[in-house]
Amino acid sequence: MNPGFDAVDQETAAAQAVADAHGVPFLGIRGMSDGPGDPLHLPGFPVQFFVYKQIAANNAARVTEAFLQNWAGV
């Protein structure tokens, strides 16, 4: 892994490869749910999993909404 990166996303890359193979436009937006450490100092699993999963989902939704509004010129 390149030390200049904080994360690697292999799942979206696979989806992109399938879309490319079939000539389908593709844009992937992901929210990262697990990073280094625990900035919220939560109890362990499963609390951390569910809290950070929701934060990641909310962040991905906000980015997607902003992208679509910008793309549509709203």
From Swiss-Prot:
Gene3D superfamilies: Nucleoside phosphorylase domain (3.40.50.1580). This is Uncharacterized protein Mb2315c. GO terms for biological process: nucleoside metabolic process. It comes from Mycobacterium bovis (strain ATCC BAA-935 / AF2122/97). Pfam families: PNP_UDP_1 (PF01048). Keywords: Signal. Residues 1-19 form the signal peptide. GO terms for molecular function: catalytic activity.
